[in-house]
Amino acid sequence: MSEALVKIENITIEYNSYGKAIKAVDDVSMDIYENEKIALVGESGSGKTTLAMAILRMLKPPGKITAGQILHKNFNLNDLDEEELRTRRLSEFSLITQASMNSLNPVLRIKDQLVDGLLDHGKFNKEENNSKIQSVLDQVQLSHSVLNMYPHELSGGMKQRVSIACAILLNPDFIVADEPSSALDVIIQRQVISTLFSIQKKYRTSILLIGHDLGLVIQFADRIAVMHNGKIVELKKTEDLLDSATHWYTKALLKSVPSFEEEQKASNRFDKLKKTREFSQDKK
């Protein structure tokens, strides 16, 4: 295993509700390695998104880190001021949200939004910027005609691909994808995940995929962390999780994954998931 790019060390996050502290994330530790695809799965309210926002220093009040630290390239993110954070976002780490419409400015054309991201990080060469923008659109398989369109003119899948293009614009080494396909239909979901896979392979970017669809993340992730009630209850390589899950919640998640071939139901669903993952990885 390569060197840890992101280190999450004993993080506890609390929300204050009517004077009472409620733990959303409870003493969580996890390493994310260079060139790794790792998934964090669990039901709604398990603490996944709260942890993801904390990793990127985007946690909003009343959420507060009350213990632990998060390191990126061995540098404590809590030590960064707002200007340093602004500089590092997009260029070193970035976010793909589950609601792409919320991350895109509705009154700006797509090209203007991409250009703004480059200008905000000191990229002023117009020719180079145009070339870079066209390149990232090619990477997410979008026509260059999208550049002259507004977000409301795009389908859900196209908007999500634009969000991915924004996230990779400055070649960050770490991306958090927070349920990037949750609002899309099944076919588009798999296209989005396939796009993430291609991006990761080309740029060797570390990606943390947040999700609740275990069947989907199995086809993407090298390792899977299972979160329940604010704790990571299991963290294993994907194949090992399928073969030897130990926590009752992980086992329940695995049993809830629907068969991919309903007309030919197998007696061992875990074997089917493994075969599906192997086929998906071979296709890529």
Language-model segments: residues:
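Short catalytic/signature loops enriched in Gly
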Residues: 4, 237-284
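Conserved ABC transporter NBD signature motif
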Residues: 64-76
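Conserved ABC ATPase "signature" region
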Residues: 76, 127-145, 254
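Conserved ABC ATPase signature
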Residues: 150-154, 158
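A short, proline-enriched helix->beta-strand linker immediately N-terminal to the Walker B motif
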Residues: 169-173
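A short, surface-exposed alpha-helical micro-motif characterized by mixed small hydrophobic
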Residues: 217-219
